[in-house]
Regions:
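Alpha/beta-hydrolase-fold enzymes
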Residues: 2-16, 141, 154-271
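Conserved pre-ATP/AMP-binding loop-to-beta segment of ANL
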Residues: 575, 582-622, 629, 643-651
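N-lobe entry segment of adenylate-forming
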Residues: 388-478, 482-497, 602-606, 993-1012
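Conserved AMP-binding/adenylation subdomain of ANL enzymes
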Residues: 634-651, 659-709
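Conserved C-terminal "lid"/linker of ANL adenylate-forming enzymes
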Residues: 903-908, 918-920, 933-1012
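Gly/Ser/Thr-rich phosphate-binding loop
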Residues: 673, 700-701, 708-713, 722-799
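AMP-binding/adenylate-forming catalytic core of the ANL superfamily
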Residues: 515, 540, 711, 823-827, ...
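Conserved AMP-binding/adenylate-forming
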Residues: 476, 491-536, 657, 882, ...
């Protein structure tokens, strides 16, 4: 005979004994049958099904006007029944009764779904977007996306994803989230470096993979959820026990009890868990941007629809400050908040949610539909306040790396022991220094025959992290494995075209992934990449750097055929059959599978002492070349990675040309060897050599879309950031660091003032030799820092500015320059280490030594920090001796409020055999020149021979593609009286201010110079 449930106990039974009997009866019934009674869920139908989800429509066809479409998304770990737990606690029923049209995304139980435990984070986000498409198609309405906990995070991501993949309306009417954190780092203890958290998460991922290789089972997710709030879990059990005698009370809580007890929990797919922990927790991508969904780089900054976020005052899983991270993450959206006196679960289930949450949501929908007012409980959300004494990772890195660099290259082998004894490191410093030691040690151990190259670095990353993102371009993400395969295919194409080891191959390309791919492919093949400048006449470049083959992009190829005089190889822009025209060979048309590898080919065989690439230097008719050995490239790459403490969680933004040293060696190199992501500037964002500025809207769009936290620069490239108005997304920017070389002191000073929490890492690298200096801390604005451990040994020799030669002792050996005085920077030549020899000076400080002149005049302060005084080529050869131009430029740009940029140079006047100091200025936005203040500042700060006698005020300065000022054209224009487009002033004797210079004043100027 089938068992039947016992009848309800007699209501008249009372007293202590009756309560005890009722408690026993109810307890036995729950134990035997799993619950007090079965209930029917709210009516619904499955209207669509995807690879990773089913779409439920609740209360279908029950009224003519279905109302606003609300699509509810559950979190991982919990089933879709979270939205319909019990008749008295049903979100879908409450929404329907409030006039909405409820739909639910059902991810199912991953442990029972085919491939369910293999799902990734992006699988769920794409599923939400597909469900939104289905709802829009069925209703003809935009969708209100609603999500609980991680389901809300999915909604944020899906909305941003829809903005990225379509130029049309994303179709999201609003976003409503419940306990959905955005700023995951808000939960970290103060002072704990996020790098350590990333490492911990990486290790935990390995542990999870070994214990639960297929993901976290449902019982473990339930236990984990309870452990997040153990007090709440215990309280719920006590409440349940206390109510065992009250059947009516038990029935009201029955659905919730069964849901939380076992039925509501599902497995957490392993890949999705690892994605969430790495992208959302360790790298904080919801706040910073740059999470990758279906190959697209996404940022919440693209969201424009209104957002309503519910927070719980006792929510220990998603505290309000973590939820409020949506304000800086989505600055274009209007964000609102409802704060409840509830915990995490109580936001969506239970009496509190039925009294407040769902009625408020219904009122919100009415307001969004234009049929009501903004709900009274809904308040504008304020951005989370900065935490006091919040020590960022970069603060720790700054301190730690400063100590590491101070200890120097010679101590690398024993650094951990020495550092712990001398400094102590207080724990956190240890963790920021030690990860850099293998990089610095690798440089220190490198010898001439050490295998190292760009291609080898890519191969290492492709093996270590094949699915990791290598570079981001035009909104798409490309993995190391995909890039490595692309390089191999290009190599086969080059071999088919006759390129061999050791040959010099010109690369004539704009800044794009194909330019990087071509350079790495030539490195893999063993050829030398000659990186040509697209805006410099090709014939002039080939005259100083002859090539055996020329490789160009489709835009540059046609114009290169005539000056090159032979067939030009074209790479990039492939996909369709195309006719490029005469003299052009389409490498994209070559089938790599049909190319046989020759016996001599050995991939990634480059050694430290070999030339890996050649850069074009100079401008106009003063072009030169810079031979970069593989060691020199490695020094810049590993030096950047170490000084900036780069890792897989970082995104480096490259807006420098890839044919410039900063682009290919600092940005590409640093990202490549560290595993950081390389974000390449959208073409129109990259600075123009003529305009000298960046498109700020696109720049900030790229920064948010890619989650950029490190921006590479060269020269005055960042001037636009400090000259323009504040951008709407600037204050919530994820940028933590600017890294590059040649930043003018004036721009650096203004940049540090405007971006107070952002550090500047300034590099100096000599054209000859392997001299590398780096200012790790950025505290001394204008300093080039200290020698990079692993680089060449450096020394400063005393220099006679007037004679233009070394100052020697009586023995004939060079005198070492005392600290505080100006000297010539020399780099020691160590052939065994694979350093470029060039034309060294021998017997400099002792018999038999060999040093290279870097051409840089420097001064070393009492702390050991180097300051660039000027380059020998820029010295002004005045009547009283040589005058450095850089200190004059620093006065003009750092001590006058109206000056933007300045270039100081030597100018020759008719009848004079020496030069006079001249300056060209640009003014800050909306600023006016003050000739009186200008003259007074120069008179007070500079001595006679250092005072510019002629000053030109221009709208812009001529610059190279690397944003360095081209002083040659300024010298050629002379006084600028015939050049037009500017004003020329001069230092007239007896005047209090600089006065305009007319053609009739030129003789007066010359006479005043002769008279001193």
């Amino acid at each position: 005979m089938a068992e039947t449930k016992p009848a309800e106990r007699n209501a008249a039974t009372g007293g202590l004994l009756g309560g005890l009997i009722a408690a026993v009866q109810n307890g036995l019934e729950i134990a035997r049958f799993g619950g007090l009674e079965e209930r029917e869920p709210s009516p619904h139908e499955i209207v669509a099904e995807g690879r990773n989800h089913r779409l439920r429509h609740y209360f279908p066809n029950q009224r003519a006007d279905a109302g606003p479409a609300a699509l509810l998304v559950p979190p991982l770990m919990l089933s879709a029944e979270i939205w319909d737990v019990a008749p008295n606690s049903s979100a879908v029923a409450a929404l329907f009764e409030g006039g909405a049209d409820p739909w639910v995304v059902d991810f199912g139980s991953p442990e029972t779904e085919e491939g369910g435990l293999d799902r990734t984070l992006e699988d769920h986000v794409v599923a939400v977007s597909e469900a939104a498409d289905s709802v829009r198609a069925a209703t003809g309405r935009d969708v209100h996306l609603m999500g609980y906990s991680q389901g809300g995070m999915f909604c944020y991501q899906a909305a941003a994803y829809r903005c990225a993949v379509s130029d049309e309306d994303p179709g999201v009417a609003s976003l409503v989230t419940f306990g959905s954190p955005v700023d995951m780092h808000r939960r970290l203890p103060l002072g704990v470096p996020t790098d350590l958290i990333a490492d911990l998460i990486d290790n935990l991922s390995r542990v999870q993979a070994s214990i639960f290789p297929n993901g976290i089972p449902s019982w473990a997710t339930r236990l984990g959820f309870q452990l997040m709030d153990p007090v709440k879990a215990v309280q719920q059990r006590i409440d349940f026990a206390m109510q065992l005698a009250d059947r009516e009370a038990l029935q009201q809580r029955e659905g919730m009890r069964r849901f939380l007890g076992s039925e509501g929990w599902v497995a957490f797919p392993g890949p999705a868990l690892q994605d969430a922990m790495k992208q959302l927790v360790a790298h904080n991508r919801l706040l910073q941007g740059g999470f990758v969904i279906d190959g697209h780089s996404i940022s919440l900054a693209s969201i424009e629809c209104p957002i309503l976020a519910f927070t719980g005052t006792t929510d220990s899983i998603a505290p309000a400050p973590t939820v409020r991270g949506i304000v800086p993450a989505a600055p274009q959206a209007d964000a609102f908040e409802v704060s409840l006196s509830a915990g995490h679960f109580g936001l969506v289930v239970g009496s509190r949610s039925m009294e407040i949450t769902w009625p408020t949501v219904c009122e919100w929908l009415e307001w969004r539909e234009g049929r009501g007012r903004l709900p009274e409980r809904v308040k504008p959300m304020a951005a989370p306040r900065d935490r006091e004494n919040d020590t960022s990772t970069l603060d720790n890195v700054t301190e730690g790396l400063s100590v590491a660099f101070d200890l120097g290259r010679d101590l690398l082998g024993n650094l951990p022991g020495i550092a712990s004894r001398q400094v102590g490191f207080l724990g956190r410093l240890t963790e920021t220094i030690f990860p850099q030691l293998p990089r610095l040690g690798r440089l220190d151990d490198m010898r001439r025959d050490t295998a190292v190259s760009m291609a080898q670095a890519l191969a290492e990353q492709a093996k270590k992290s094949p699915d990791g993102t290598f570079f981001l371009f035009e909104g798409r993400a490309h993995s190391y494995q995909a890039a490595n395969e692309r390089i191999d295919n290009i190599v086969r194409g080059l071999l088919q075209c006759g390129v061999r080891q050791g040959q010099h191959v010109g690369v004539l390309m704009d800044t794009r992934p194909s330019a990087v791919a071509a350079t790495v492919a030539l490195s893999r093949l063993g050829a030398v990449a000659v990186l040509l400048q697209p805006d410099t006449p090709l014939a002039a470049q080939l005259a100083v750097a002859p090539v055996d083959h020329l490789l160009a992009d489709p835009e540059r190829g046609p114009d290169a055929v005539e000056p090159y005089g032979s067939d030009v190889l074209v790479l990039g822009g492939g996909g369709d059959v195309r006719d490029l025209g005469p003299g052009l060979i389409d490498m994209e048309a070559i089938d790599p599978d049909q190319v046989a590898l020759p016996e001599w080919y050995e991939p990634d065989a480059g050694m430290a002492g070999e030339v890996g690439m050649i850069l074009i230097t100079g401008d106009g008719d003063q072009l030169g070349i810079n031979r970069v050995t593989n060691r020199r490239w490695a020094t810049s790459a590993y030096g950047t990675a170490s000084a900036c403490a780069l890792g897989p969680g970082d995104t480096v933004y490259c807006c420098s040309p890839t044919y410039h040293a900063t682009g290919i060696m600092v940005c590409v190199g640093g990202a490549l060897v560290s595993g950081a992501r390389l974000a390449m500037a959208t073409p129109s964002t990259a600075p123009s050599a003529e305009l000298g500025h960046v498109d700020l809207d696109r720049f900030w769009g790229d920064v948010r879309r890619y989650g950029v936290n490190v921006v590479g620069y060269s020269g005055s490239m960042l001037g636009a950031l400090v000259s323009g108005p504040e951008h709407p997304t600037e204050r919530s920017s994820p940028i933590q660091l600017f890294a590059g070389s040649g930043m003018p002191k004036g721009i650096w000073k203004r940049l540090s003032a405007r971006f107070e929490r952002t550090r500047v890492v300034e590099f100096f690298a000599s054209t000859e030799g392997n001299a590398v200096l780096v200012n790790v801390t950025g505290r001394k604005i204008g300093s080039v820092g200290r020698p990079l451990p692993g680089g060449a040994e450096l020394s400063v020799a005393a220099w006679d500015l007037d004679a233009g030669e070394l100052i020697r002792e009586e023995s004939g050996l060079a005198k070492r320059c005392p600290r505080g005085e100006i000297g010539l920077l020399l780099a020691n030549v160590d052939r065994a280490r694979g350093e470029m020899a060039g034309r060294p000076m021998r017997g400099v400080f002792e018999a038999g030594d060999a040093w290279l002149r870097t051409g840089a005049l420097v001064r070393v302060d009492k702390d050991g920090d180097y300051w660039l005084v000027d380059n020998l080529a820029n010295l002004i050869q005045g009547s009283a001796g040589a005058v450095p131009a850089l200190p004059i430029e620093n006065v003009l740009t750092t001590e006058l409020e109206f000056t933007d940029e300045a270039a100081v140079y030597g100018l020759t006047l008719p009848g004079l055999e020496y030069e006079i100091p001249a300056a060209a200025l640009t003014l800050r936005s909306n600023a006016k020149l003050d000739p009186l203040a200008l003259r007074r500042k120069i008179q007070n700060r500079l001595v006679g021979p250092h005072r510019p006698l002629v000053i030109r005020v221009l709208s812009r300065l001529p610059k190279t593609a690397g944003q360095r000022v081209r002083k040659g054209p300024l010298r050629e224009e002379g006084l600028g009286l015939e050049a037009g487009g500017g004003e020329t002033l001069w230092w007239a004797p007896g005047e209090e201010a600089y006065v305009p210079l007319s053609p009739g004043d030129v003789e007066k100027l010359i006479e005043s110079v002769r008279n001193g």
